[in-house]
Amino acid sequence: MFRGANAINLDVKGRVTIPTKYRQSLLDDCQGQLVCTIDTQQPCLLLYPLPEWEEIELKLSRLSSMNPHERRLQRLLLGYATEGEMDKSGRFLLTAPLREHAHLDKQIMLVGQLNKFEIWDHSVWQQQIQQDVATEQEAAFELTERLQDFSL
């Protein structure tokens, strides 16, 4: 399980260095094989261990290519999906199209989301968090049934 927000830097080749605390788990669970794709709702990337991504691919394969909404989701997620392996230094290459989608510069955030990571540009992440906190504090939204039963 991945949790926490980690401020890290992209190197000049566009590689993200996975923090040490996650590396052994990724090596044990998937031999460092990762898949990165875009988030279709946010200006960030989604980085999955290969077995987690394969479950998503299975779900995507069940969508209808005749339904334009389902086809669009397949096109975006699969079209941007890039498989790679962490190198011995724990680095993973983010391709130029992926970096462009998320507006990634040198400073980025790697954010654990249980079974995957989100990758954000540092300044975009800060703006998103401020917006999310403000929305939660306003409570000007309707709680879903699941959230009504959720407590911390």
UniProtKB/Swiss-Prot annotation:
Entry GO MF terms: DNA-binding transcription factor activity; transcription cis-regulatory region binding
For this chain, the family text in UniProt reads:
Belongs to the MraZ family.
Q: Which organism is it from?
A: Pseudoalteromonas atlantica (strain T6c / ATCC BAA-1087)
Sorted alphabetically, the Gene Ontology cellular component annotations on this record are: cytoplasm; nucleoid
Question: Which gene specifies this protein's sequence?
Answer: mraZ
Q: How does it assemble?
A: Forms oligomers.
Supply the InterPro entries for this chain: MraZ, MraZ_C, MraZ_dom, MraZ_N, MraZ_sf, SpoVT-AbrB_dom, SpoVT-AbrB_sf
Does the record carry Cytoplasm as a key word? yes
**Taxonomic superkingdom:** Bacteria
Which keywords appear in this protein's UniProt record, sorted alphabetically? Cytoplasm, DNA-binding, Repeat, Transcription, Transcription regulation
Q: Which segments constitute the SpoVT-AbrB domain?
A: 5-52, 81-124
Question: Where do the TM regions start and end?
Answer: none
Where does it localize?
A: Cytoplasm, Nucleoid
Any one Gene Ontology BP term: negative regulation of DNA-templated transcription initiation
Q: Primary place of residence? A: cytoplasm
Protein name according to UniProt: Transcriptional regulator MraZ
